[in-house]
Structures are given as structure tokens and as C-alpha cells.
Amino acid sequence: MLILISPAKTLDYQSPLPTTRYTLPELLDNSQQLIHEARKLTPPQISSLMRISDKLAGINAARFHDWQPDFTSENARQAILAFKGDVYTGLQAETFSEDDFDFAQQHLRMLSGLYGVLRPLDLMQPYRLEMGIRLENARGKDLYQFWGDIITNKLNEALAAQGDNVVINLASDEYFKSVKPKKLNAEIIKPVFLDEKNGKFKIISFYAKKARGLMSRFIIENRLTKPEQLTGFNSEGYFFDEASSSNGELVFKRYEQR
């Protein structure tokens, strides 16, 4: 079983690390090509392209400039510990045991605009390059054209290595669009998280993102290997709703706190 999650915009390169082990990203040659393109952008162009403030644009221009392919534990940190968005709040990788990291390294992948696919312990230098950004490059007009089949092929390699054909899609639509389902040698299961609001169940972005992290943690902590085991997920008040679910979609609901 291979779990897919999105990266985060918020990064943490200060907190203590629970493990000293690391691996290197497998698609760095591609990352270097994107860095070459990104370095051509001025801070105002970055601000416009990414729809971010001038201050953030300056920070990210400096990150592109400082990025270099020799990754060490001094200039980079493990991806699963560097990302700090809502998904990662639910995941809480900083509390993982070494055995948890082992399982995650085999069964969890982070999709990335710059790195393509990251394993949890892959070192990562700080960056901001969302998958949906229209960064022109030698392969096309955006990052989807740049990555082409590369991400899908890398996921197929991971599935083959574990002798499995199930992908748990906990990534956002923006990121999963970089995967080509018809070329993926897998059954795709998508957990959906609905929260009650004024008597109706709907996707509430903040809660849904955190729930994706909670589900990832549930799979890792319990060493789950079959999709039917996911129905036991009950973290923070969620419960499986079989009636609302279908073959490829597992629906989990949570009642409003009154």
C-alpha cells in the first residue's frame, strides 16, 4: 500500500530532529533543471507567479539562488520533518519511532513541484514551488508538462518494490493531477473527510487536510497493508460511513462539536 500526500508551504528547519537517518531524493537531476528556470525569475515575477507578498517573493528568490545539489544534514532536512502544514499537524512525524520511519519510508510518498516524489527521510532544501504554478520550462508550459510520466513511473517502482497494487490518495487535487491514473499500476482508494456544519456534512478544508495527516499516521502506526483496514479509522471523532462510500472512495464523517 502506497500513501500519497501533498507537501506544505510552511517549513520548519529549526525543531529538534527525532532521527538522524536520511536518504537522498531520487529525482534531483530534474530538480536542478527547475532551479535553473526558477533562477531566471525576478522577485516581482515570483510574487506575480505565486501570488505571494514581496517579502515572501524575496525569500524564495534567495532560496532558489542558494539551492545546490550537494545535500547534507547541515543544509537540508528530512522532508517529512521539514513540512509543517495542516496535513503534517495531523501526521505528527516528530513523534515517530524509528520503526514508524521505516514503515513510512516504504509506504508514504510526498508529491512535490520541485522534487517530484519524496520519501519521508529524503533530505530537502527549503523551497516553494507549488505543482499548479505555470513555470515555463524546456518540457512545456507548466510543472505538469515538466514531470510528464516521471512521477507516475517512480510510484510504479515503489509499488513493484513492495509487491503491491494499492494507492491511498490523500493528496490534494492540485498534486494528484501530476499522477497519471491510467498508467499507474494500482487500484486507487481516495478517503474523503466530511465535517458537519449546521446539520450538513461537507468538506471543510482545514479539517480535511489535518484528517489526511491523521489517516496517514493511522496507517503507519498500525502497519496497515490492506485498504479494508482503513475503515477502522476513528481519530479525533471521525467514523466510517459505509452508505456514502463507493469502491474507490471511503467516506469518513464527524459530527459538529456541540
UniProtKB/Swiss-Prot annotation:
Cellular component, GO, one term: cytosol
Pfam families named among the record's database cross-references: H2O2_YaaD
A Gene Ontology BP annotation from the UniProt entry: response to hydroperoxide
InterPro entries listed in its UniProt record: YaaA
Domain of life: Bacteria
Family per record: Belongs to the UPF0246 family.
Entry-linked NCBIfam families: PRK02101.1-1 (NF002541), PRK02101.1-3 (NF002542)
Name of the protein: UPF0246 protein YaaA
Organism, scientific name: Escherichia coli (strain SMS-3-5 / SECEC)
Gene: yaaA
